[in-house]
A protein has these predicted regions:
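Active-site regions of oxyanion-processing enzymes, predominantly non-cytosolic
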Residues: 38-61, 99-156, 209-218
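Histidine-centered active-site microenvironments of extracellular/periplasmic hydrolases
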Residues: 134-137, 206-264, 268-271
């Protein structure tokens, strides 16, 4: 969370490359991408922040975000609501929407799209907060979800062969006594948050159509991570476990109308690093750095074309790597913050080391997780999609486990180093 892509350290990013290639880059929303202390000027032309005149033009007053303001909804410390992240229905106070920061960024983006008359190609970066917890949303999205259709939660029957960070968070959040009705309400609220994002995407698309930009636009919609939302009796997320509810995120790609495409859902495994690779190919830009993303354009015309045989995730840290523990988040809490149960586990340096470095390898059938200091994990996703039965010590699975280990080793060999594209001179020039 506090180690961003630093251009001074040889870590460029898609926005800066587009900006350097004469794109007009408009950025509205949170950062979590580049070092805040270095500013945004090398990455975008506009970093949108609404002012008083914007709110007057829109006809709304800004409403407080869910992480601040009145936190009475958390209840008292020590109760089973305090770390639940469950806020519930947002009160409209006589208005049609709860005009929080996401709505402001969306309205700012639509204003920009409708008013833009420049000659530069556009890049619009809109990193909204929803559906990140706390779990809360206004009507009509709060009641839009049929509670009877909310899918059941995944639950562990045993915890001793699971990562210790999970048991630590479980004990810290204190939600083990929740009834299924309470979990269903929380999960339905989360789905309502997703429905609000869907609606907001529709409004953005309408503004692109009104500006005659939709057909020429490539649109990418995805999430940076998932959420437990009650699975395994947990809320929010971890930084070093890789259940599908956390790592298998939605990814939607709408290409420009001029591109050949067979519409539909693709079942190939992809990684989020395939997003910038695809964007570069759409823009006809050769990035000035080596990367391991694979463009998705070939999947547009052939739904059966191979893409990746496996995908990977990494997280956690080694002992004594305190600088990678997200300790900065703990310093900013000023008390028992919502994230305290997780951050406390990440700060531990005793015999139990919950924030252990870990790496996941997943293919279409299996998931293998290598953990530096704890028990590895192996799941058969075909028979156990909820990843509840750890088969790492099952002798009958030894060959499959070895195959996944070898695949992870090959991936490390393929991606462990990045050689700069620019060559150096061998001799001193002065």
């Amino acid at each position: 969370m506090h180690h961003m892509l630093n251009p001074g350290g040889g870590e460029p990013n898609l926005l800066s490359v587009l900006h350097d290639n004469d794109y007009f880059v408009w950025w509205g929303g949170k950062n979590d991408l580049v070092p805040g202390q270095l500013g945004y000027e090398k990455h975008c032309d506009v970093h949108f922040r609404p002012n008083r005149s914007d709110y007057e033009r829109w006809g709304y007053e800004p409403r407080e975000g869910s992480h601040g303001g009145d936190l009475a909804w958390r209840g008292k410390h020590g109760t089973d609501t305090f770390y639940s992240f469950f806020k519930g229905k947002l009160e409209l106070a006589g208005r049609d929407i709860y005009f929080d920061g996401d709505w402001a960024m969306l309205y700012g983006a639509m204003d920009f799209i409708r008013a833009y008359d420049g000659d530069q190609p556009l890049c619009l970066f809109l990193p909204l907060g929803y559906p990140h917890p706390p779990y809360c949303v206004e009507e009509p999205w709060f009641s839009m979800i049929d509670r009877g259709n909310v899918p059941p939660r995944h639950q562990y029957q045993r915890w001793d062969d699971k990562p210790s960070v999970l048991t630590g968070i479980r004990d810290g959040q204190g939600l083990v006594g929740w009834s299924e009705d309470r979990w269903t309400e929380l999960r339905a609220t989360y789905f309502g948050m997703c429905a609000r994002v869907d609606h907001q995407l529709g409004l953005l698309i309408e503004s692109l159509r009104e500006a005659n930009l939709y057909d020429d636009s490539a649109m990418f919609v995805f999430s940076d991570h998932g959420d437990f939302t009650g699975d395994y009796g947990l809320v929010e997320k971890t930084q070093n476990t890789f259940q599908d509810c956390l790592s298998r995120v939605p990814f939607i790609f709408k290409p420009p109308a001029a591109m050949d495409v067979v519409p539909g859902v693709r079942n190939q495994l992809i990684e989020l690093i395939d997003f910038p690779a695809t964007a570069y190919e759409c823009a006809g830009i050769e990035p000035p750095y080596w990367h391991f993303g694979k463009s998705l354009l070939s999947l547009l015309v052939d739904a059966d074309t191979p893409h990746r045989d496996a995908v990977f995730c990494e997280g956690g840290r080694l002992r004594r790597e305190a600088h990678a523990s997200e300790r900065e988040s703990a310093r900013g809490m000023g008390g028992p913050g919502l994230y305290s149960p997780k951050i406390e586990q990440q700060l531990r340096e005793d015999d139990v080391f919950p924030h252990t470095k870990a790496t996941m390898c997943r293919d279409g059938q299996y998931k293998y997780v290598r953990r530096a200091y704890e028990t590895d994990e192996f799941y058969d996703l075909g028979s156990d999609p909820g990843e509840t039965d750890n088969l790492i010590n099952d002798p009958s699975r030894a060959r499959s486990i070895e195959r996944m280990r070898d695949r992870m080793l090959a991936w490390y060999m393929e991606t462990c180093d990045v050689v700069p594209l620019a060559a150096d001179q061998r001799n001193f020039s002065r």
